[in-house]
Curated annotation (Swiss-Prot):
Keywords tagged on the record: ATP-binding, Chaperone, Cytoplasm, Nucleotide-binding, Stress response
Organism field: Verminephrobacter eiseniae (strain EF01-2)
Assembly: A double ring-shaped homohexamer of HslV is capped on each side by a ring-shaped HslU homohexamer. The assembly of the HslU/HslV complex is dependent on binding of ATP.
SMART domains referenced in this protein's UniProt entry, alphabetically: AAA, ClpB_D2-small
Organism taxonomic ancestry: Bacteria, Pseudomonadati, Pseudomonadota, Betaproteobacteria, Burkholderiales
Biological process per Gene Ontology, one example term: proteolysis involved in protein catabolic process
Subcellular localization, as worded in the UniProt entry: Cytoplasm
An example Gene Ontology molecular-function term: ATP binding
InterPro entries with a match to the protein in the record: AAA+_ATPase (IPR003593), ATP-dep_Clp_protease_ClpX (IPR050052), ATPase_AAA_core (IPR003959), Clp_ATPase_C (IPR019489), HslU (IPR004491), P-loop_NTPase (IPR027417)
Protein name: ATP-dependent protease ATPase subunit HslU
Length: 441
């Protein structure tokens, strides 16, 4: 679990997301509260439950990006799901309990990777020894003592191996054969039995070994992973992962507005209301069975988001509304925001296109007036057609640099200056013609 302060979390989010300070503050406080709760002693810790967040705002303003960046900062089991992918129990489709099962999978994967890193050095030493045993077989009939000459040769080869001088040489090694992935389709509600069957069948032939001819660099990676797997305790990993998912897990539910229905609608919307009712016990606290064991959801943080164009947060069932006490509204983006997205973010579109074309020795030089004009056109197109927020910049940039991208090999060694005139020449007519901008931009 991350111990970053709210200020540090917001500062990190600022590198990738422009504006939306209230949403950033809300998720930063929620994340910090997870750490604060862990510091509370005694029975009171169990009584402190997370305050779930509902983010409301139009498309393309940063809701999903906040979730993506939060996942990297959290250092905790994190999963992002689309509310529209789930159906009410009894209908064909995924049920909401699969959210927690997926979170458990993520927690186990994260814990295993963490444990593997701890034993990496020992695993690499063991892998080196196995490769050296193939390169320099021990003398037959040896009484266990290594002759001085062989020891010197072994150390010389170990040095070459570590310096990468042997990476391209071929070697034959015995490795554990990877288990084939077995997919078993089971009826809804029988997921636990399906997992047990899959686990049982996957045990067959799991210890088979076969000889493979590989480059030493590939063999080193394969053997290191194999040796690391021997050094970690799988049962301990599962136990710690379940506890981590229960205490620190974060679930981000996108498109929650798509399962909110207006009162006058009917028909297929019955299933949508059913999804809300099925989500309710998860959010307020229940126990879900996974292949690793039972997970209690009482302390899992839920963050939901939606544009709410055709519905309102009040169209969610009242019980679910009450489970998301913190509501933050994200604002539509202005021209200045578009400019900041293009110039100030850590991996802005400008930097991405410059890096892509630099691979063909083409230098893209964006002048401030050109970027301002580009931001204005993106904003105007959003105003006149559908407002898709910052995603409009990707469309406009692709159109702007279409010619340069196509002729990059011919322009090798040249500098292309993107100024106001260049932007107008390629985009002004399209942006002024509403029909063209609707279909092209």
């Amino acid at each position: 679990m991350t111990s970053m302060t709210p200020q540090e979390i917001v500062s990190e989010l600022d590198k990738h997301i422009v504006g939306q300070s209230s949403a950033k503050r809300a998720v930063a406080i929620a994340l910090r509260n997870r750490w604060r709760r862990q510091q509370v002693q005694g029975s009171l810790r169990q009584e402190i439950t997370p305050k779930n967040i509902l983010m409301i705002g139009p498309t393309g303003v940063g809701k999903t990006e906040i979730a993506r960046r939060l996942a990297k900062l959290a250092d905790a089991p994190f999963i992002k799901v689309e509310a529209t992918k789930f159906t009410e129990v009894g209908y064909v489709g995924k049920d909401v309990d699969s959210i927690i099962r997926d979170l458990a999978d993520m927690a186990v994967k994260q814990t295993r990777e963490s444990e593997m890193k701890k034993v990496r050095a020992r695993a690499e030493d063991a892998a080196e020894d196995r490769i050296l045993d193939v390169l320099i077989p021990p003398p037959r009939g040896a009484d266990g003592a290594e002759p001085a000459a062989d020891g010197t040769t072994r150390q010389m080869f170990r040095k070459k191996l570590r310096e990468g001088l042997l990476d391209d040489k071929d070697i034959e090694i015995d490795v554990t054969e990877s288990r084939p992935h077995l997919e078993i389709m089971g009826p809804q509600g029988m997921e636990e039995m399906t997992e047990q069957l899959r686990s049982m069948f996957s045990q067959f032939g799991q210890d088979k070994r076969r000889t493979r001819k590989l480059k030493i660099a590939e063999a080193m990676k394969l053997l290191t992973d194999e040796e690391a797997g021997k050094l970690v305790n799988e049962e301990e990993i599962k136990t710690r992962a379940l506890a981590n998912a229960e205490q620190n897990g974060i679930v981000f539910i996108d498109e929650i507005d798509k399962v909110a229905t207006r009162q006058e609608t009917s028909g297929a919307d019955v299933s949508r209301q059913g999804v809300q009712r099925d989500l309710l016990p998860l959010v307020e606290g229940t126990t879900v069975s996974t292949k690793y064991g039972m997970i209690k959801t009482d302390h899992i943080l839920f963050i939901a988001s939606g544009a709410f164009h055709l519905s309102r947060p009040s169209d969610l069932i009242p019980e679910l509304q009450g489970r998301f006490p913190i509501r933050v509204e994200l604002e539509s983006l202005s021209v200045q925001d578009f400019e900041a997205i293009l110039t100030q973010t850590h991996a802005s579109l400008v930097k991405q296109y410059q890096a892509l074309l630099a691979t063909e020795d083409v230098t893209l030089a964006f002048v401030p007036q050109g970027i301002t004009r580009l931001a204005c056109i993106a904003f105007e197109v959003n105003e006149r057609t559908e407002n898709i927020g910052a995603r409009r910049l990707s469309t406009v940039m692709e159109r702007l640099l279409d010619e340069v991208s196509f002729d990059a090999t011919r322009l090798s060694g040249q500098t292309v200056t993107i100024d106001e005139g260049y932007v107008d020449q390629r985009l002004q007519q399209l942006s002024l013609n509403e029909d063209l901008s609707r279909y092209i931009l």
